[in-house]
Design a protein with these regions (language model features):
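Register position in tetratricopeptide repeats
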Residues: 127, 161-162, 195, 230-233
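Alpha-helical adaptor scaffolds
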Residues: 107-181
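Conserved positions within tetratricopeptide repeat
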Residues: 135-136, 169, 200-204, 225
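TPR alpha-solenoid repeat register
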Residues: 151, 185, 219-220
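TPR/TPR-like (Sel1-like) alpha-helical repeat modules
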Residues: 194-217, 229
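Long, contiguous interaction/recruitment modules in multidomain scaffold/adaptor proteins
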Residues: 1-114
Length: 235
């Protein structure tokens, strides 16, 4: 396909945006299940607590779905000349798969290689301290393939640098809901919770990952070694 010869139209951008809205609703349902049930309190009613949870979820979803057209523009502007054809092919592929949305993240919607291509471009924004635009780009990768762990971590790092602590907390919670034994996410999530003095949370995440590695007989793996080192630094 001669991607560079095709015009990436506004209509196609809106098609992508509409489709990603369906998957965003699915993600919101996951997030609601991550919160602890409200408890009776003299300070806040059950309904007030539920409203606060919904506000936090809505805030995160605004982050997650903010301006698809902006993200596409950033990728096309940031990619090197030799990357442009590949990037356009990925976007056209996203449009061509519109009929295959099933109401949940599709682990195979965009391939690992294609995610890595986009992530290399987004990483330049992170390295260049352009965290706001980097966040746009990492979020867009997640919307194309929700099971690419580097994009979740990149998004979290951008929001952390922007000072959006509550968003970072929810990002890691949602990422670990989708990929509970992804050791890349586990290690970065633990580091974040240690940095905000939530050591019990960090230990719980690390221990869960460690136990899974033991179950899989991977005690000699690099992931096991790194988790052990992280646990030693916390305990």
């Amino acid at each position: 396909m001669q991607g560079s010869s095709k015009k990436f139209s506004k209509e196609k951008l809106h098609q992508i945006e509409d489709t990603l809205s369906e998957e965003t609703e699915f993600a919101k349902e996951y997030l609601r299940g991550l919160f602890d049930p409200p408890k009776t309190s003299p300070l806040k009613s059950i309904q007030q607590q539920l409203d606060e949870q919904d506000n936090q979820i809505d805030e995160l979803m605004v982050f997650a779905h903010r301006d698809t057209e902006k993200a596409v523009e950033l990728f096309l502007n940031e990619c090197l000349p030799e990357e442009r054809l590949k990037v356009e092919e990925i976007f056209f592929k996203a449009v061509s798969r519109l009929g295959e949305i099933t109401g949940k993240f599709d682990a195979h919607s965009i391939t690992l290689e294609e995610c890595e291509c986009l992530e290399e471009i987004a990483k330049r924004k992170l390295i260049g301290h352009d965290y706001y635009n980097g966040s746009h780009m990492y979020r867009f990768i997640i919307q194309l393939n929700g099971f690419f762990s580097e994009a979740w971590v990149g998004w979290a790092l951008c929001e952390q640098e922007l000072g959006n602590w509550e968003a970072v907390d929810l990002i890691y919670q949602m990422a670990l809901e989708f990929m509970p034994y992804d050791y890349y996410i586990i290690l970065f999530a633990a580091d974040f919770y240690i940095s905000i003095n939530r050591k019990e949370k960090a230990i719980a995440i690390l221990e869960k990952g460690k136990q899974q590695l033991i179950t899989d007989h991977l005690e000699n793996s690099q992931s096991f070694k790194e988790i052990q080192e992280s646990l030693k630094s916390v305990v």
